């Protein structure tokens, strides 16, 4: 009985932590990723257009810059403008997690933490990218993260609709997606 209460308490805590995030029962879906993914063409600056809210992003003007390091890994620099006007940034590293599917990357921001999936589901390299990440939690449920990215601060609505259609056709829930405010933003990088 005590173990069941502990498990239920842990689940309640995880649900509270995942508030606003896409929390679902069952295992992560396995959508197809971008075919013939070219990492070198993907490098550079991307602006966040829409996302499923995540606890670690609190600001607006969110952007990411990907660059190749000497060791062949990818430097990831994420930046946002906080409500108080200060810039928050975090640097991490991305590596290929599946050699046969180069669009499946793993991203790590802290040494002792495991890599998080970073799957590029679709990109044309010049305008848009659709990124999906999903983590299974104790084999009972999963938490989705989705980012629609653009090389510019705004994407045409038909492009956003096209990318959301990819998600829904793979049974990925988009209900909690929100716009990222990119108005009057500085270029951080």
Swiss-Prot record:
Where, per UniProt, does this protein localize? Answer: Secreted
A Pfam family recorded for this sequence:
Lipocalin
Task: Report the family membership.
Answer: Belongs to the calycin superfamily. Lipocalin family.
Origin organism of this chain? Cavia porcellus
> Could you tell me which PANTHER family the record lists for this protein?
APOLIPOPROTEIN D
Q: Which residues carry this modification: Pyrrolidone carboxylic acid?
A: 21
Taxonomy, top ranks, is: Eukaryota, Metazoa, Chordata, Craniata, Vertebrata
Has keyword Metal-binding? no
Keywords for this entry? Disulfide bond, Glycoprotein, Lipid-binding, Pyrrolidone carboxylic acid, Secreted, Signal, Transport
What name has this protein been given in UniProt?
Apolipoprotein D
UniProt function note: APOD occurs in the macromolecular complex with lecithin-transport and binding of bilin. Appears to be able to transport a variety of ligands in a number of different contexts.
